């Protein structure tokens, strides 16, 4: 295949990472991004790698699978992780970022790379004669989505994804919250709004009866479990939220707390957490409260949360339809297309779920696109690593039951020998092996 550059379509997390990895290997890149010419309902800016849901890249410890994935990506020179570290905001044991500062930094690093040419245009056809990484995301334009679905004989998959509301910090009643991270991990980074049992029962009643924004009548309500609307969770049972985003465990009242509580209990019945959303600390999001309620209903119901009685919503929660591919049938473990070998796919459209996972897929696709360009052998990362196990999972899962997947220790190859019963010790050993295997892989 004779060509002088590689195409990357889409400048989200995956596309930005792929373009950067290719350029860092000395190959010119044409990076196409339609925003600036054609917008989407979910994006608010024209910047690259815009975070449209949460501002959290989740746990940072190596005993957390996504923490391991991030460490692997750091060692691979990820532009997404470098930008995230530079724009991080307090979030206890998690890596959260100033969402605007983060996307601005990614944009600057990519746009200013001497080997990356940014083209603001919509692509409606899949190239057939140029090595191309397609990373158009779950919000791929209709015209291009049709071409991608055609690779799968016209059968496309979808699920619904949702974002949580964002609050002006000056409208939060600070007398009703306390600063703490769960189990006191890391710095005290979350504002915690405790609820008594009666407050929770009243809130649950209002939530399950609130009016949702309509979906298209011909589409079933299919949600990704990791980003489920809070009202859907509430309808699964009155205690479901107490084991999810409103879990009180590890968030005991501080000694100086004087607000309402149930008797002498040291832990609230339920807790709503608010997390800093920007570096200035002027915005907070409601953790785990992705929603598809009508905006007026969001205001009515969420103002029942103690401290948010007079909250001003800078952004209401929204939901959007995400499309993804039948990756077990369509992709190699390098994210290369089985049917059209000049194409690589990356990002959430491949069935990886999450910001970090999307960027990781772009990293692998970019590396392999560069290797194909140079006529080098493909790079299949070990399935003992988080980044390799993710690629292995989406390309080896049962196609009939394939659904988007976050990275987790369950998809990483088990340790050899007798099973370590202590979970933390087992995860530490898996992480230790993963990083050792990655280093060995990179030296071959």
Curated annotation (Swiss-Prot):
Predominant localisation class: cytoplasm
Membrane-crossing residue ranges in chain numbering: none
Gene Ontology biological process terms in this record: tRNA methylation; tRNA wobble uridine modification
Keywords: Cytoplasm, FAD, Flavoprotein, Methyltransferase, NAD, NADP, Transferase, tRNA processing
Localization in the cell: Cytoplasm
InterPro entries: FAD/NAD-bd_sf, MnmG-rel, MnmG-rel_CS, MnmG_N, TrmFO
A GO cellular-component term linked to this record: cytosol
UniProt key word Methyltransferase: yes
Pfam families: GIDA
Enzyme kind, highest EC tier: transferase
The family this protein is said to belong to: Belongs to the MnmG family. TrmFO subfamily.
Functional summary from the UniProt entry: Catalyzes the folate-dependent formation of 5-methyl-uridine at position 54 (M-5-U54) in all tRNAs.
Protein name, as recorded: Methylenetetrahydrofolate--tRNA-(uracil-5-)-methyltransferase TrmFO
Organism: Streptococcus pneumoniae (strain Taiwan19F-14)
Species classification: Bacteria, Bacillati, Bacillota, Bacilli, Lactobacillales
């Amino acid at each position: 295949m004779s060509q002088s550059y590689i195409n990357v379509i889409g400048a989200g997390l995956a596309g930005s990472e792929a373009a950067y990895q290719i350029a860092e290997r000395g190959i010119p890149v044409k990076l196409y991004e339609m925003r600036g010419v054609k917008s989407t309902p979910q994006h608010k800016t024209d910047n690259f790698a815009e975070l449209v849901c949460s501002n959290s890249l989740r746990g940072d410890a190596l005993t957390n699978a996504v923490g391991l994935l991030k460490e692997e990506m750091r060692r691979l020179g990820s532009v997404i992780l470098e930008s995230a570290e530079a724009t991080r905001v307090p979030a206890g044991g998690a890596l959260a970022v100033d969402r605007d500062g983060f996307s601005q930094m990614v944009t600057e690093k990519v746009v200013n790379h001497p080997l990356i040419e940014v083209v603001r245009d919509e692509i409606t056809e899949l190239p057939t004669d140029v090595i191309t990484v397609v990373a158009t995301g779950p919000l791929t334009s209709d015209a291009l989505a049709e071409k991608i679905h055609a690779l799968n004989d016209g059968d496309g998959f979808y699920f619904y994804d949702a974002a949580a509301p964002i609050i002006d910090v000056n409208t939060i009643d600070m007398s009703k919250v306390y600063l703490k991270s769960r189990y006191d991990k890391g710095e005290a980074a979350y504002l915690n709004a405790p609820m008594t049992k009666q407050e929770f029962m009243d809130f649950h009643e209002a939530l399950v009866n609130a009016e949702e924004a309509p979906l298209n009548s011909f589409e079933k309500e299919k949600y990704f479990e990791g980003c489920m609307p809070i009202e859907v969770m509430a309808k699964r049972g009155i205690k479901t939220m107490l084991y999810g985003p409103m879990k009180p465990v590890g968030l005991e009242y501080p000694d100086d707390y004087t607000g309402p509580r149930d008797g002498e209990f040291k832990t609230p019945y339920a807790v709503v957490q608010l997390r800093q959303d920007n570096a200035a600390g002027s915005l907070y999001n409601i953790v785990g409260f992705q929603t598809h309620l009508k905006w007026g209903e969001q205001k009515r119901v969420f103002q029942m949360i103690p401290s948010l009685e007079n909250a001003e919503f800078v952004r209401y929660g929204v939901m959007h339809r995400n499309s993804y591919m039948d990756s077990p049938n369509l992709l190699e473990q390098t994210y290369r297309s089985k049917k059209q070998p000049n194409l690589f796919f990356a990002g959430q459209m491949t069935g990886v779920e999450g910001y970090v996972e999307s960027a990781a897929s772009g990293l692998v696709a970019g590396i392999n696109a560069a290797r194909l360009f140079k006529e080098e052998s493909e790079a299949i990362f070990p399935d003992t690593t988080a980044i390799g196990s993710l690629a292995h999972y989406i390309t080896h899962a049962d196609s009939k039951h394939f659904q988007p997947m976050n990275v987790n220790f369950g998809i990483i190859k088990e340790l050899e020998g007798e099973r370590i019963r202590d979970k933390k010790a087992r995860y530490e050993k898996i992480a230790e092996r993963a990083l050792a295997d990655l280093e060995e892989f990179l030296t071959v």
